[in-house]
Amino acid sequence: MGQKCNPIGLRLKIINTWDSLWYANKDYTTKLHEDFLLRKFIKKAFYHAAISKVVIARKVDLIMVNVYSAKPGVIIGKKGADIDKVKQQIVKMINNNIELNIIEVKKPELKAVLIAENIAQQLEKRISFRRAMKRSVQNCLKIGAKGIKVSCAGRLGGAEIARTEWYKEGSVPLHTFRANIDYGFSEAKTIYGIIGVKVWVYLGETKSSNE
């Protein structure tokens, strides 16, 4: 089971929590779709800001959006000009008041999503997939990860037949629920087609939130 499903979803309410912090009796699908559009828009608007996650909380007349980024300066811009512009665009899109908070990610080398995006960007620049995977794995372990596993799938190196290549170092116990495992996925759009990049990072054992 642990090998097949998303490690973050599997550990919800054990050591992880949701990225959408709200409850709704009605209009649930509308609000869920709004969350999806918000995340998509923010990711697209700040593609180079290394965004690891977007947490959305709702009140009656306010939507609070916390953006976790390794490069907060890219989002804020000069004197906050960029962030104000994005706020106005979001208000137009969802027709509601919004509070946008930017939170800096201290160790981006340990965030699986950012590692996957970094590898995907290297593949798009035609860097060897083995070199890209190995470099990211070494950087992650150097910062303090207990283990990391990386998978690249597609027409690697322009090969005629698609295949999957793995690179793993250290321990990644996917079946252990108390194991704090971060998971990330990204796609590299190359001239040969799309290459999928998956990353699992083991950060050590954590006490469950129920204890």
UniProtKB/Swiss-Prot annotation:
Name assigned to this protein: Small ribosomal subunit protein uS3
Keyword flag Lyase: no
Pfam family, one: Ribosomal_S3_C
GO MF annotation list: mRNA binding; rRNA binding; structural constituent of ribosome
Record GO cellular component, one term: cytosolic small ribosomal subunit
Keyword line: Ribonucleoprotein, Ribosomal protein, RNA-binding, rRNA-binding
GO term, biological process aspect, one: translation
Known partners and oligomeric status: Part of the 30S ribosomal subunit. Forms a tight complex with proteins S10 and S14.
Function text: Binds the lower part of the 30S subunit head. Binds mRNA in the 70S ribosome, positioning it for translation.
HAMAP family with a match to the protein in the record: Ribosomal_uS3_B
Domain of life: Bacteria
Protein family (similarity comment): Belongs to the universal ribosomal protein uS3 family.
Keyword hit for Ribosomal protein: yes
Domain KH type-2: 38-106
